[in-house]
Amino acid sequence: MMNLQNSYNQVVILFDEQGTPTFREDRETNFFLGVSVMYDLSAEDFIFDQSRILFGLSNTGALRNRKISNSRAVEISQLLPELPIQIVISILDLSDIEFQRVVNLYRDFGDIMRERYRNVRGRPIAQILHPQVLDDCIFNSICDYSERNQINSSFLVFIDDWSIPVNDIEIYLEDRSRSFQEKINSLHSEFNYGFEINVGEILLLNQDSYRKRFIGIIASVVSRAFLNNDNVRYSEVPLNNILSSEINQKNDITNKVKQLLIDVMDDSSRNPPL
């Protein structure tokens, strides 16, 4: 999709999700989270060196969820603000009744439109909600980096190997890369910024690696603040430690996504595909 140029600073963004995007009553948490970690590619070796032992990056098996003790989760959260990284957390409240109503309506509406105009099957709710947290994390990460540094930058985006339908993977990933790049460069042009960004094709973290383990552990530690209160791993301490760094952010996007879905349905109703 693009050639990385030496004049462009190379930046890595890792993304993972936590929770199950479903409205079933037996879910472990009422929240679905997207978590991204961003850093300069030139700092990657330093970051992994500093976290290798505590994160168990070189262990035979990856640390995640129940394998991370409460005390280690706190230690990890204390280290993160000291590393040259930015963490963005995007949250959907699955217990919001109005949100449930709008998402279910959007799913039914979308199924009709997909079958009528594209002759394809409908999407489950999970595939509606996952792109929302992904887009919010990546967009905010790139915008923040651009505003702080104001230099030509190439973003290398890696996301967890989630259940994107096989037939949609190429379109899903390429369209998002192109969309991020066009939207942000359009904003830069509007405000007369003298720099631009490139977003490479989004890649899947479908094999074990330091990058996959690093983002997986951070997402697991963050998620503890969003578990049900009776869960033995529930704790707000790790999240508060992470947010002690002003560069890190937590965004509840429930209402924003709700309005977005309403707007999409309204627009599609007024301007149906030809």
Give the positions of each predicted feature.
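Phosphate-ester processing/binding pockets and catalytic centers
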Residues: 1-274
